[in-house]
Design a protein with these regions (language model features):
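RNA pseudouridine synthases
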Residues: 1-342
Length: 342
């Protein structure tokens, strides 16, 4: 699949070579540029084929053809798309956004090499004769439902990943947690946002479990830095920042919406547990449930977490894109029982 990218040379790029601006302005690799160089009209300046050593001037129009290499094509085992239909939220020639159901992995791992969301996307691409690698931008845990974004080419993937790391691309989640938040916590009403800054590390007693280190209280932890602290016995910690808003409270459970400044493994699950409000259905972080409240809590057979919204800039035209994933049945049933709506 070919992708043509055009951009205007900015003043600070004047005097540089075509290759340099392709690498710095577009983030292209040397291999991508080399492949384009040997195509007919693969690289053009102001509509005329040019060399990568040519010098550019302000306002020059540079166009390059990005063609998928053979080893860049989809290599995953494909699900039959008819048997496993995708719920597509948005699609164009550069990106695909889908609503992931709970119960499947985002991409192959361990014994799951052919039954993941990425395999479903592979089958969808195959059916549409779209020949490109499956590139998820971030992932969701197996039991988490909601929006997953895929890039259809390497440049889109690079730019979306850069947005994710800088915070331009961000998601908003809905979760149902155990317990009622104290009056002090929600004193500013349900419209207030609260922040958790506990760093996270792997536990020593379980290969999958993470834990929050609460020695730091609510003090700020630089979101870009992994650091070493004597408080953790010189164990490497991962900074983690979660913002949450309380939407509904009952004596035994609450509904919250959350946004992340960092994207650590199990971050929402670990931070909510550290606050004393583990997610309903999360058997990894809450083995037992209070007997006196079981009858009052909704029944969830998976972790009660849904990636609800996403906002980002289109990787090529820079337009803002905002998407929302419809709630799954278990969330809808819970909300209907209490006459709650978002």
């Amino acid at each position: 699949m070919e992708k043509y990218i055009t951009f205007a040379v900015e003043e600070h790029m004047t005097g540089q070579t075509v290759e340099k601006v392709l690498r710095t302005a577009l983030g292209l690799t040397k291999r991508q540029i080399s492949r384009a160089k040997f195509q007919a009209d693969g690289i053009r300046k102001n509509g005329v084929q040019c060399r990568t050593t040519d010098i550019v001037q302000t306002s020059d129009q540079i166009m390059i053809c990005i063609e998928a290499a053979k080893n860049d094509l989809n290599h995953l085992v494909s699900f039959c798309e008819d048997a496993h239909p995708l719920e597509i939220l948005y699609e164009d020639e550069d990106i695909l956004a889908v609503n992931k159901p709970a119960g499947i992995l985002t991409h192959p791992s361990g014994a799951h090499y052919a039954d993941t969301l990425s395999n479903q996307v592979s089958g969808y691409f195959h059916k549409k004769k779209v020949f490109c690698r499956v590139r998820p931008i971030g992932r969701l845990d197996k039991e988490t439902s909601g929006i997953v974004l895929f890039a259809k080419n390497q440049v889109s993937a690079q730019r979306l990943q850069a947005q994710r790391e800088s915070g331009i691309l961000h998601k908003q989640y809905i979760a149902i947690v155990m317990g009622s938040f104290s009056d002090d916590t929600s004193a500013l009403s349900n419209t207030a946002w609260h922040t958790v800054c506990f760093p996270i590390r792997k536990t020593a007693d379980h290969p999958l479990r993470m834990e929050a280190i609460t020695d730091f209280g609510s003090s700020f932890v630089p979101e870009s830095a992994d650091f070493v602290t004597p408080l953790a016995g010189m164990t490497t910690l991962l900074s983690a920042v979660t913002h949450y808003q309380i939407l509904y409270r009952s004596p035994d459970w609450s509904i919250v919406t959350l946004k992340l400044d960092t994207g650590r493994t199990h971050q929402i699950r670990v931070h909510m547990k550290a606050l004393g409000h583990p997610l309903l259905g999360d058997t990894l972080y809450q083995k037992t449930f209070p007997a006196d409240s079981l009858s009052e809590q909704p029944v969830f057979h998976r972790t009660a977490l849904h990636a609800w919204k996403i906002q980002f800039r289109h990787p090529f035209n820079n337009a803002w894109i905002s998407l929302e994933a419809p709630l799954p049945d278990d969330f809808c049933n819970c909300f209907q029982n209490i006459n709650f709506s978002l």
